[in-house]
């Protein structure tokens, strides 16, 4: 009887242990998946798959906003309706429609409505009441609840660097703590090695990517040869030869008939870097807006460059230690001009620097269609700004340049990539390679500080900001990783990529 009681006790203890292990396993699985998904409440104005372009808050809040004042409403730009005899075809948006009305033309099943289609600042486009409600669910408790895995990542990376890991150890022997990261971090590790693919993405991001591919909003049809085994030198020369920097110069319709030749700067962007007594920029810094740049202490290093490129509404004030203070040129997407909440007319971050704007256009480069139905109405605000601030250099990138960059990515990728323009980051990198002798890019490929924090100046978390959904981000970053001339230690510790300027390359035709 005593022997059977002992067996019974062992059985009970074994059952308790089994249940404890099962509970811990389920808890670990639940926490990993919570990190993978962005935390957004039901009814939030943040889109289900907020990627790095359009905010779904536009859909409900912009109808209450005042139209952006600009030349679009004046007689000059309105004359395009009569001078060309072109009324927008059925299904094509009229330029007079507000962004809030634009979404009504997009089928409810469209990924451009579900996931978004422009890079933006997630918080800044919410009204204060909505922002307060959203923050109470989505970001106020991030540090204690949502981003547990990110805290583990930061502690792991701090441990690695405090132990003074040698250069040769970094790329090959990654700490076991880092190896236990979530799926998004495993993708970043493959990004460091240049071996990333869409099969490594989470189901959520793969689904968003496939939806964009199937929607093909810009009617992309790529029939050219793909070669994925180019050497770094071959890839650099392909970039130099096939990505010809170009801006809207007013010489093509519909811009020529509207007198845009009088609005655009006399100095082409291609020669912008020669304005300092004929000297080009020797060193340039491209500073991404990624959350990983926080606590980097890279500010002084960034400011030591001859020219510094920043993106969209990324500020320097309050973040000087990490991002520096100097801004020479800023690339902005069309939402910055069109959405009053970005304060394009009044904010000091857009003043006393060179501005370069861009907006998606059809792959066929139909400029009339683009002018009639831009993703966001940048044309009116652009002309108004040029009239009021003629002394400031301000350009709009030509759609042909954007799609040349997209072709470049697809031609070096065996997989079918998202048929949407590259990110502002990739556009900025290639633009500065055309203007500078040497380039340092910070946190475009994330360092060991990698986090799901989208932008260093916002409290919003989503892996899509690093890995992409709308933009072919993983493929862009794979290309930049392949041409990196810097050390692995610089990449992992600083998030710094070193690239040559096109002017320093010797390439055949």
UniProtKB/Swiss-Prot annotation:
Belongs to the glycosyltransferase 29 family. GO terms for biological process: protein glycosylation; sialylation. Its main location: Golgi. It is a single-pass type II membrane protein. Residues 75-86, 93-123 have a biased composition (Polar residues). The chain crosses the membrane at residues 11-31. Residues 32-509 are lumenal. One of its GO terms (cellular component) is Golgi apparatus. Keywords: Disulfide bond, Glycoprotein, Glycosyltransferase, Golgi apparatus, Membrane, Signal-anchor, Transferase, Transmembrane, Transmembrane helix. Glycans are attached at residues 241, 352. Disulfide bonds join 237-507, 284-436, 454-465. The lineage of its organism: Eukaryota, Metazoa, Chordata, Craniata, Vertebrata. It catalyses: a beta-D-galactoside + CMP-N-acetyl-beta-neuraminate = an N-acetyl-alpha-neuraminyl-(2->6)-beta-D-galactosyl derivative + CMP + H(+). This is Beta-galactoside alpha-2,6-sialyltransferase 2. Its EC number is 2.4.3.1. It is found in: Golgi apparatus, Golgi stack membrane. Residues 42-123 are annotated as: Disordered. Transfers sialic acid from the donor of substrate CMP-sialic acid to galactose containing acceptor substrates. GO terms for molecular function: beta-galactoside alpha-2,6-sialyltransferase activity. It is an enzyme of class 2 (transferase). Residues 1-10 are cytoplasmic. The keyword Transmembrane helix applies.
């Amino acid at each position: 009887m005593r022997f059977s009681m002992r067996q019974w006790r062992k059985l009970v203890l074994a059952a308790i242990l089994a249940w404890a292990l099962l509970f811990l396993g389920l808890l670990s699985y639940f926490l990993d998946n919570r990190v993978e998904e962005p935390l957004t409440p039901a009814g939030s104005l943040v889109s289900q798959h907020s990627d790095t372009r359009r905010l779904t808050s536009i859909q409900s809040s912009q109808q209450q906003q005042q139209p952006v004042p600009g030349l679009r409403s004046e007689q000059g730009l309105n004359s395009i309706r009569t001078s060309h005899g072109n009324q927008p075809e059925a299904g094509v948006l009229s330029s007079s429609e507000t962004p809030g009305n634009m979404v009504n033309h997009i089928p409810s099943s469209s990924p451009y409505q579900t996931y978004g289609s422009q890079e933006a600042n997630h918080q800044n486009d919410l009204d204060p009441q909505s922002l307060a409600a959203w923050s109470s669910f989505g970001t106020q408790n991030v540090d204690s609840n949502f981003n547990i895995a990110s805290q583990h990542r930061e502690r792991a990376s701090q441990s690695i660097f405090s132990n003074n890991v040698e250069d040769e150890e970094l790329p090959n022997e990654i700490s076991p703590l880092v190896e236990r990261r979530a799926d998004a971090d495993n993708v970043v590790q493959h990004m460091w090695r240049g071996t990333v693919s869409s099969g490594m993405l989470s189901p959520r991001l793969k689904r968003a990517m496939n939806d964009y591919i199937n929607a093909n909003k810009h009617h992309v049809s790529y029939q050219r040869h793909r070669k994925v085994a180019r050497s770094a030198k071959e890839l650099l020369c392909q970039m130099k030869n096939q990505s010809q920097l170009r801006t809207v110069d007013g010489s093509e319709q519909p811009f020529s008939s509207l007198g845009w030749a009088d609005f655009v700067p006399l100095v082409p962007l291609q020669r912008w870097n020669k304005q300092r007594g004929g000297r080009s920029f020797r060193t340039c810094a491209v500073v991404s807006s990624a959350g990983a740049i926080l606590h980097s202490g890279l500010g002084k290093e960034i400011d030591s460059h001859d020219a510094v490129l920043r993106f969209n509404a990324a500020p320097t004030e309050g973040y000087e230690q990490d991002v520096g203070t100097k801004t020479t040129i800023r690339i902005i997407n069309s939402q910055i001009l069109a959405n009053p909440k970005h304060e394009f007319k009044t904010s000091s971050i857009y003043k006393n620097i060179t501005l370069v704007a861009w907006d998606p256009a059809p792959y066929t480069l139909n400029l009339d269609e683009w002018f009639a139905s831009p993703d966001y109405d940048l044309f009116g605000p652009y002309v108004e700004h040029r009239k009021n601030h003629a002394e400031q250099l301000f350009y709009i990138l030509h759609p042909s340049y954007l799609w040349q960059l997209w072709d470049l990515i697809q031609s070096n990728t065996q997989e079918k990539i998202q048929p949407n323009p590259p990110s502002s980051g990739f556009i900025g990198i290639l633009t500065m390679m055309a203007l500078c002798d040497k380039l340092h890019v910070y946190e475009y490929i994330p360092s060991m500080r990698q986090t799901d924090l989208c932008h260093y100046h916002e409290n919003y978390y989503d892996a899509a900001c690093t890995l992409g959904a709308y933009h072919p981000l993983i493929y862009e970053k794979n290309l930049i990783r392949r041409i990196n001339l810097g050390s692995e230690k610089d990449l992992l510790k600083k998030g710094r990529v070193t690239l040559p300027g096109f002017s320093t390359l010797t390439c055949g035709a």
